[in-house]
């Protein structure tokens, strides 16, 4: 580098330095002018403030004098003469005690200022702006008087325990961090979005469920019976899909099916899953009311994962989320996150748990990369939505919102936060609420937020309507039962003369219906009989007369146990006790319609053990306690005997309504014949044993038990591959499995592959022959399930034999 180049570089540096110095001089000049202007404003403010403080000092002086008079005896040894409350002192002793004041303001009286001669110097010398300090002190004062209100708004980003403890902070601690609280309060407002102006909003495809063919063939009666067997599912809302009973009916991917069957080992669906999953997958807003631990988490995670897969993935500039799960507590959020990760594994779907008390920086870093599912408490989600002026997260992609334990969300005071969150999400979102109860706050929220929701209630009440009072009477002989009925009806007619209190008497057969009608007519009581043996016109005529007659009495069979709606019916008498739970539920349901109250009275003979078992299961505790002691003890004995017989396999509970057409009649005839053989000591002829009961077609199974920690599971493996096709269908159809599950509590699962006759697996890698697994907590439950299943297998074998005969397979 020559001398000329060095000189040029030096001149450039010098010119640059002069330019920078000139800028600094201008800036310094401006800052000096600004400082002088600020000092002028400060002097004006101090002058005005001094005038205000002088007025306050007068009030304080009066207060301090009164306080000094009250404490004169106490202070007599401390001072020799009365000192003024304020101002200077003439003596040395006064100077020594000048720091003591007679009036000590409370800690929250932060707006009280005593200006001294050196105040102005301190204010000027202090590095902080005195005007800002004064404003902060005013904020402190406001925050002290409204501490609980501030904390109430701030605590939304903590869980319920933190917020409740925060509210108990005393006034002594109030001034701490009041500026921080004020700032936090002011920022927690999610930016509103006008979705009518949002461009390129993704169109949602929420209906992802197709009803299987086997469910489509079910009648309304079958669906009603299935819901009753699934812990008495109650539906409120229009066009609710039918409940499923198998995972395979949901159309899940092979990865999810493998996860459910092999890793999670979910053999069957819980009642809430049976009904809620198809409803949510259909794109409907759902309110699920079920007790905790009933499988609700899987009920909303499966549809959520499926909907996310059906949507376009997040773009590189999108942070998400697509699904939002709100919970009232951190612990529940963490628990849901653990389950969500299981379903997201290997699917490319990401999930994050955001709760108060966790590392916010790490959550922000993950959110910037984009997430599909956020599991959060309401407060922490609002924190994230308001960060970076609302640019960290965008709610425009949120299409699926879940509120788990929604009742607790509102009980813990998260209602305003939830409303704020829901208000910023797109209006065509799908919303799912799960709750153990359905309080009024939640009802109001659901009516405002959800669109045409389906409400699914699982076993929230008894099987019997709360408006119905159940009663029971036990008899030894039939004529005593009739005399009791006669007296009850006579007393009732006399008591309600001039009123309209109708009665329905249910009997077990058409013959008894006609007989009871004649006997009551002979005793001066007019009734209207209806049963399937009467012409249709006569049945309609008698039903119309019953409705038009005050205090009318209707005698009928099970033909009217469902569908009859006469609000004036206040008494139902079950003359022949119900043999099934479904029959009993629908029979007593003829009274207590709507908001009316009713009474259901069951007549039970001492040998009707199954009926006693049903009554004990259906009657409420207060109803059982109101039964006369003699009747209650006998009812309990009968129930205990039947329960013991269920465990040993001696007794079994009839399923459904008991009516199975001609097949059912054949079973009754066979049972009657066997009973006669037993009564007369006659041995059945071996030639009477049918082919289907021989060893060649007998249901084959192996039994065992499995130890799992402190519990034992009993199981049986049933070979159904070699059964006739009709028998195999009869044993494995949905209705059979659900009924047996209801009666025994056992779980069912089919495994293996079907092999035609004469064929089977060739090596160990091939699937075994088709078999059915039955598992239960008690050995007696498995025994009972095997017996019920064997009955169904025999039924199928009998149908197969009849079909072969009709087809001409066997001819002379």
UniProtKB/Swiss-Prot annotation:
InterPro entries: DEAD/DEAH_box_helicase_dom (IPR011545), Helicase_ATP-bd (IPR014001), Helicase_C-like (IPR001650), P-loop_NTPase (IPR027417), PRP5/DDX46/KHDC4_KH (IPR056149), RNA-helicase_DEAD-box_CS (IPR000629), RNA_helicase_DEAD_Q_motif (IPR014014). It is an enzyme of class 3 (hydrolase). SUPFAM superfamilies: P-loop containing nucleoside triphosphate hydrolases (SSF52540). One of its GO terms (cellular component) is nucleus. GO terms for biological process: mRNA processing; RNA splicing. Residues 277-456 form the Helicase ATP-binding domain. It comes from the Eukaryota. This is Pre-mRNA-processing ATP-dependent RNA helicase PRP5.
């Amino acid at each position: 580098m020559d001398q000329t180049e060095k000189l040029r570089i030096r001149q450039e540096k010098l010119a640059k330095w002069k330019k920078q110095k000139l800028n600094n001089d201008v800036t310094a000049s401006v800052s000096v002018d600004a400082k002088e202007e600020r000092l002028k404003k400060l002097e004006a403010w101090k002058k005005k403030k001094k005038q205000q403080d002088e007025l306050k000092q007068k009030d304080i002086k009066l207060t301090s004098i009164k306080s000094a008079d009250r404490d004169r005896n106490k202070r007599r040894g401390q001072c020799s003469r009365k000192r003024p409350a304020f101002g200077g002192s003439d003596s040395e002793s006064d100077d020594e005690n000048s720091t003591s004041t007679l009036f000590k303001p409370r800690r929250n009286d932060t707006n009280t200022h005593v200006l001294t001669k050196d105040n102005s110097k301190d204010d000027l010398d202090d590095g902080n702006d005195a005007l800002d300090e004064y404003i902060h002190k005013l904020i402190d004062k406001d925050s002290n008087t409204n501490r609980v209100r501030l904390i109430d708004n701030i605590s939304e980003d903590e869980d319920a325990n933190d917020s409740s403890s925060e509210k108990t902070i005393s006034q002594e601690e109030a001034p701490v961090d009041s500026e921080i609280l004020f700032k936090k309060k002011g920022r927690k407002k999610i930016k509103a979005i006008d979705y009518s102006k949002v461009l390129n909003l993704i169109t949602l495809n929420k209906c992802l469920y197709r009803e299987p063919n086997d469910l489509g063939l079910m009648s309304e009666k079958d669906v009603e019976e299935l819901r009753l067997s699934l812990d008495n599912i109650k539906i409120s809302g229009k066009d609710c899909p039918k409940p499923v009973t198998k995972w395979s009916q949901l159309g899940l991917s092979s990865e999810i099916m493998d996860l459910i069957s092999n890793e999670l080992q979910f053999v069957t669906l819980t009642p809430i899953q049976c009904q809620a999953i198809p409803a949510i997958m259909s794109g409907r807003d759902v309110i699920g009311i079920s007790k905790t631990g009933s499988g609700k988490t899987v009920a909303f995670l499966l549809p959520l994962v499926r909907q996310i897969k059906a949507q376009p993935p997040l773009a590189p500039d999108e942070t998400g989320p697509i699904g939002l799960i709100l919970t009232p507590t951190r612990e529940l959020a963490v628990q849901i996150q653990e389950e969500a990760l299981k379903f997201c594994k290997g699917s490319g779907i990401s999930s994050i748990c955001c709760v108060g008390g966790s590392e916010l920086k790490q959550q922000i870093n993950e959110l910037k990369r984009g997430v599909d599912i956020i599991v959060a408490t309401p407060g922490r989600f609002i924190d994230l939505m308001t960060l970076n002026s609302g640019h960290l997260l965008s709610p425009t992609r949120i299409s699926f919102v879940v509120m788990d334990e929604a009742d607790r969300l509102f009980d813990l005071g998260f209602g305003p936060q939830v409303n704020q969150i829901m208000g910023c999400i797109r209006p065509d979102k799908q919303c799912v609420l799960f709750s153990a109860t359905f309080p009024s706050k939640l009802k109001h929220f659901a009516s405002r937020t959800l669109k045409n929701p389906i409400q699914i209630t699982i076993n929230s009440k008894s099987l019997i309507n709360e408006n119905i009072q159940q009663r029971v009477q036990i008899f030894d002989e039939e004529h005593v039962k009739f005399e009791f009925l006669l007296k009850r009806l006579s007393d009732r007619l006399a008591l309600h003369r001039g009123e309209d209190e109708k009665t329905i008497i249910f009997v077990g057969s058409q013959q008894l219906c006609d007989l009871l009608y004649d006997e009551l007519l002979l005793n001066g009581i007019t009734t209207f009989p209806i049963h399937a043996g009467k012409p249709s016109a006569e049945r309609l005529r008698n039903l119309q007369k019953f409705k038009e007659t005050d205090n009318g009495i209707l005698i009928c069979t099970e033909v009217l146990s469902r569908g009859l709606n006469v609000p004036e019916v206040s008494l139902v008498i079950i003359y022949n006790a119900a043999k099934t739970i479904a029959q009993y539920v629908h029979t007593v349901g003829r009274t207590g319609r709507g908001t009316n109250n009713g009474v259901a009275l069951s007549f039970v003979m001492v040998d009707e053990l199954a009926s006693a078992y049903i009554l004990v299961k259906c009657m409420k505790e207060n109803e059982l306690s109101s039964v006369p002691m003699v009747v209650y003890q006998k009812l309990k004995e009968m129930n205990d005997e039947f329960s013991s017989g269920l465990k040993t396999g001696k007794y079994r509970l009839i399923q459904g309504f008991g009516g199975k057409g001609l097949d059912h009649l054949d079973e009754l005839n066979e049972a009657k014949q066997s009973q006669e053989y037993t009564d007369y000591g006659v041995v059945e002829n071996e030639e009477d044993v049918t082919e289907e009961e021989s060893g060649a077609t007998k249901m084959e199974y192996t039994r065992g038990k499995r130890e799992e920690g402190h519990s034992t599971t009993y199981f049986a493996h049933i070979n159904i591959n070699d059964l006739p096709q009709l028998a195999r269908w009869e044993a494995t159809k949905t209705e059979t499995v659900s009924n047996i599950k209801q009666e025994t509590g056992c779980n069912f699962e089919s495994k293996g592959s079907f092999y035609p006759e004469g064929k089977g697996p060739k090596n160990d890698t091939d699937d075994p022959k088709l078999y059915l697994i039955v598992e239960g907590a008690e050995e007696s439950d498995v025994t009972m399930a095997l017996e019920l299943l064997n009955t169904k297998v025999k039924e199928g074998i009998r149908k197969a034999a009849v079909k072969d005969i009709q087809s001409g397979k066997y001819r002379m």
